[in-house]
Amino acid sequence: MLQSDIRKPSRLITKGEIDLISRFNILTPLAIAVLILTHAVGAQQPAIQKPAEKKAEEKATESAQKKTEKSVPPPVVTSKEIAKTATAEQVAESSILVYGGLIGGRQTLNQIRKTAIEKGKISVTNAEGKTEQATYQRWTQRAETLAKEKIRLELDFPNARYSLIFNAEKIFGIHEDQAFTPREDAARSFENNIVHGLEALLRYKENESKIELGAKEKILGVEYYLLDVTDKQARKTRFYISTKTFRVMMLDYQEDGRKFRRRFYDYNYAQGTLVPYLTILWADEKIIEQSEVGNITFGQKIDEAIFNAG
């Protein structure tokens, strides 16, 4: 059974709240407990005031309230009110914070995911409608921007084994230690997985991409923020971000008149960062790819020679 959007209580996160969480996430519960305890003790031991003292105190309180009336800060805006006027940046940054484990956000992702080694299973349906099964292994060397990353995807089919490599914005293949030029459709599919993937959102600032927030949309009872991310090559990806969890549940992009939709399921945490363990890709409402992560680790040393041609 495919996992749908997990409806956990969540809300839009402001930059001010991020600072408060990081600075006072330990002290705040203690402070609240002290305030509650103080209030309880005070309630149990009420002070007895004389009529004259009570009137004098009321006058002093009224005078103090008038003096400070102009300096009282505006009321705190609730999460529901923020959600009504959410900006593209607020939605994007809130989602990044969730994927980074709620505390570090972008900083945590950069620290933990310096490298990634992923293993799993994949099924691919070709243009003739034939589905092939394979195991895969993926190595990623993180860089300042998505375009500068180094990625190697090794595919092991029953009758063939080869690798596709993304390095210096170029794509080439390796078969039996020999470099080759992959078919155009295979190279394009590999590239789309990179430029139209989750990292396009999580690293929109580093990539200098433009973001635009559209109207919210409800699909099968689940409400989404629709966030468009367009990179410097004018490649646009629309992300459907849950208004409850701020997880990306699916994304859309178009190419050569075809509409592609990638859905994400089975979210779980790996080394404190959020990862979808099941991904399904549709092309014109037909499933053409399904991948399932078996194991993923971050931060391990990778020999950069594997990203070279031979």
Question: Which ranges hold each PLM region?
Answer:
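Short, ordered beta-strand-loop transition motifs
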Residues: 144-147, 215-223, 270-271
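Compositionally biased, proline/threonine/alanine/serine-rich low-complexity intrinsically disordered stretches
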Residues: 43-86, 95
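Gly/Pro-enriched, hydrophobic low-complexity segments
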Residues: 52, 222-309
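Flexible, processing/modification-adjacent segments and terminal tails
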Residues: 76-91, 97-100, 168-235, 255, ...
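Bacterial N-terminal signal peptides that target proteins for export
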Residues: 5-30
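Bacterial N-terminal signal peptides
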Residues: 29-39
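Well-ordered beta-strand positions enriched in small/hydrophobic/aromatic, beta-favoring residues
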Residues: 118, 151-153, 171, 211, ...
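N-terminal mature ectodomain segment of secretory-pathway/periplasmic proteins
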Residues: 75-179
